[in-house]
Amino acid sequence: MYIILITNNNMNKVNSGSRIVFLDYVRVVAIFMVLLVHSIEPFYLGGEGTYVASWGDALWVTFLNSALRCAVPLFVMTSSYLLLPVKGDGMTFLRRRFVRVGLPFAVWTLLYAFIPYWGTEDMSISENLSRLVFNFMPHAGHLWFVYMILGVYIIMPIISPWLERVSQRGERMFIMVWLLSTAVPFLRVAASATGFAEVWGEASWNEFGALYYTSGFIGYIVVAHYIRTYVNWSTVKTLCVALPTLVIGYIIVALPFYLQLPDAYPVNDSIDLAVRWELSWCFTTTGVALTTIALFLLFKLITKPCRIYPFFKHLSKLSYGIYLVHMFVLVAVFGYVSAWGLATPVVMLLTATLTFIISALFVQLLSLLPKSKYFIG
């Protein structure tokens, strides 16, 4: 049982039927990474906002979570690789995406508003509903992703004509400028030493700096299109580029977090402390961008289905439903697993694994219902 890698440049887009094989692997791995991220969060988020019980917990949080920050951008690149450039009418494209993504999102948002987590105290449904007028609910914070991806879909028909006309050099230039924008959060920290945290045109009356319009998740959209259109490398070249990029990216993600860890434990502080620690973990910062691109290139080496591919293909189809439902499952699972007295990394991995299995089985059952696409995607 193995994965066949093909080095022939003409074979880098081999698919099984109408599906691009490696993207199914990306989706399954990325959704598990997301579940693992959320299984790690209780080990540094809690108490007054930030809570770390021990130095050992801090290390596990640092080294494991730093390897997982690319999960969300991988989803963005997967969608972009498949959908760009948008063909046909933009409104038709948006209607299809909003039906496929937006309707299940609306269903599960309401379920999170009305149903409390297992073992939690009663919640205020009226407060939840009033919050939904403006944003996602704090206890369903994972739904931020859907707001973001819907925004990505909105921009896709707009940039598609440019992607169809721009030269390889022009697209590469945009990517380089975008990569520069991923350093802006770190530049703000450096600039704060001068007494001002704004950089390159930012001010109290203008949050749109010089690189604002080339920053954010749009970079992953363009990178995915560039890889599909122009990157037809051999296995050797891919490994020579991707592996060093992965290592460098991981160091940029993990080291700033590690260097901020305190000496005394337990740590119990406001949420602002965790927010400061997480600067290098943000999804559009340099390290996360590099690790995302590197992993995507490595997955792209998978060009033929192996024996386990049908299993991954099926899980890939369930991935959005797993994402929507998993917090209901994870909170209950973590409550049980954390009480078993296991080592910290075992609790993290076991919680994520059990959550993945239970969520997948539940979504599979839901998929058997009529019109299931409207509530699991």
Regions found by a protein language model. Give the residues of each.
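Alpha-helical transmembrane segments and their immediate juxtamembrane cytosolic regions
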Residues: Y2-G377
